[in-house]
């Protein structure tokens, strides 16, 4: 088979170039069907106990993921008529959105007062325009009811907080866009505005994934281009390696889209887990192409003949690249058995990209090299690169000092094993983003000044009319609030 491939590729170079390109273009059309999914909960196994509990809460109480809007000014009290007027307008505009199920703010909350032995329930903010006396009454009521205040006003009375709950079937990216649009349109530049909450974070993920992938690919390709130019010293050779990389990426992304189109399966949605796929495939495809081109130049120095050099290169490289690709594909395909369903799509799609990189490296690449008119006096052909000379020197040191190299490898391995005991697992979504960015600053602000961007929902089954049930809820809340990372808790027991 190897001899047949070598003969066929070198005898039909144009065919070996055109067919892979046509296949790449066809597969690339599948990108139109690619779906970017922002639902982080969808990545959890359906049989996970906490996921089942979360689904039960969703089914009974609706969406548990909210967006927070906080506005105000540092070192300035929020208790003034203009702020209450804006809060009223913003709340009403948010309630008018078809994507919004519920809005919670001072403008929607009720107050319970005792009048002549009777319980009187009224609106906490009765009108949009308030007098200073009415504002003082609202402030006094909030000071007496700290659990309500913690949800509506910041710790230092500088910011108002609004909680927006979407309908369960509304995508978070859609929800995030409409809420931010309303918030920015109503609130003036006189106020600091902060957005947060899990729905806001996950709604921002699709755009962030696209931006991050674009930046990472540009940086990766730039670094790769510099290294390849230093090593290969030939623009055409570098371009051919890039052609292998880009076509592999296109086929991988296109295959993912085609699978969504043909199966409709969420396993092939592009989620935050998949954001590492392009960089991983880039390195693998680059490795295949560079191995081939570097070996070709090495043979050219000896034989001074393109076809003979290609024959020897293909005869030497084809099987190792095939075995490397096969074992890598097998490793990624094993993700099909992972409990997280998106990992199945991850493994299959990146395996397709790896397979295409192998095909391109053994057909398209040698065919393109064979039709190129090479300058036998160029430095790429006549002299070994600095990297090649360094590796040759290193190889001699390894073979002449086997015990030292083996001991050093074992020592590094032991240090790595010790490091495993210091490994930390971080599940805080805020740590995904760099400090100092607008996104991270808003999350930190709501965590520090408000009730926080993350919450825990507890679903209790029992009679709400039974005093013992309510007392147990109160005990549970007290236990939770003893945790220094819990800012507040509330339940029907607080109302009763």
Residue positions per predicted region:
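Solvent-exposed, non-transmembrane alpha-helical starts
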Residues: 43, 64, 77-85, 122, ...
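Extracytoplasmic
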Residues: 49-52, 93-164, 171, 181, ...
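A short beta-strand structural signal in non-transmembrane regions
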Residues: 67-73, 147-184, 194, 455-463
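Short amphipathic alpha-helices in soluble, non-transmembrane regions
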Residues: 83-94, 174-183, 472-480
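Solvent-exposed, non-transmembrane loop/terminal regulatory segments of multi-pass membrane proteins
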Residues: 32-78, 132-152, 395-396, 422-464
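N-terminal pre-first-transmembrane
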Residues: 67-102
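Membrane-embedded transmembrane helical bundles of large multi-pass transporters/channels
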Residues: 1-38, 42, 55-56, 128, ...
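Juxtamembrane segments of multi-pass membrane proteins
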Residues: 401-496
